[in-house]
Amino acid sequence: MLELLYTALLYLIQPLIWIRLWVRGRKAPAYRKRWGERYGFYRRPLKPGGIMLHSVSVGETLAAIPLVRALRHRYPDLPITVTTMTPTGSERVQSAFGNDVQHVYLPYDLPDALNRFLNKIDPKLVLIMETELWPNLIAALHKRHIPLVIANARLSARSAAGYAKLGKFVRTLLRRITLIAAQNEEDGERFVALGAKNNQVTVTGSLKFDISVTPQLAAKAVTLRRQWAPHRPVWIATSTHDGEESIVIAAHQALLHQFPNLLLILVPRHPERFPYAINLVRQAGLSYITRSSGEVPSASTQVVVGDTMGELMLLYGIADLAFVGGSLVERGGHNPLEAAAHAIPVLMGPHTFNFKDICARLDQASGLITITDAATLAKEVSSLLTDADYRNFYGRHAVEVLYQNQGALQRLLQLLEPYLPPKTH
């Protein structure tokens, strides 16, 4: 009964969704494009019979990069279709994989749209990153006997409490899933408490630890650092949200009194906020360039606004230390491990609930510095820039946490083998 009500409500609110897409399209025109894909209509052919992977956020897409590359290496004859929900996620997939994968939007959770989609790609296996539990998608896959794996699965106490209110509906939903590969024991226990069977849940660890700085990326970062700031200190503030850019800029202005040649790389989380961040820098009276301009910072450039997609790992490689945003405002923070992979100190605000386990491990190992405002941010950045030993201490411990917790990728790949043809590599 609840399933029918859910589906009926979803059909009823479609006009509101169209209005929302149109309104969002004012700032981000890509939201007004490719509406057909959201209902299972595609203008180009898609190769069927492969692996489908869905990631809703940019962070999930980044975590999926090593997994997709490993699957392509092991099963080169199987097409991989990566689905997202937003233009930002779409851009990230295209910049990460190019033509190596097929990319489309996942249709809304409407039975007819999903049937058109599944008829088109007819996957052998479906992977959903983290916790995107779409009832009609799960039901359609179950009906077609297509294995469904929730990879890198996580479930916060708050989300679990919300799902628990739905009782049997959620239990039925979970038992239609083939395998839940949980990030840690707590996540696994929450899925079981909601109704998943013990043999459905396996703890694999977090895929977010299985990132690495390739030799090619490291070489590119060294070259860019020589071009941009061969004799200047550099710090980076990434994935910033509304309210954080002003804090970062205030800290940078304070730091310039002590380090007149200090360069800040400022990377807002969402592309539609690039113009807003640029305006804040301009209002602060700071000399700036944008990454998209292709210009090289001059000796007088004080800020580079990172307004391109898919370059975050490269930009981390230029910096001496990093502040990771979404953490000074209540957004739960973003992934600190991308900075840690470069063995640089990581600073975050107190709001890190999206990465609670990862941040706890970094904090316990002296790989994370917590700040609360512009003053403490400026103070810690100053200390790190002044003392190379202090800076190296935090950078070394951060990357050690990364290395010590790797292995989730290999464990997940082994779990997927029964659902795929024999690997060729």
Question: Could you describe each region identified by the protein language model?
Answer:
Residues M1-H425:
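Nucleotide-activated sugar donor-binding and catalytic core shared by glycosyltransferases
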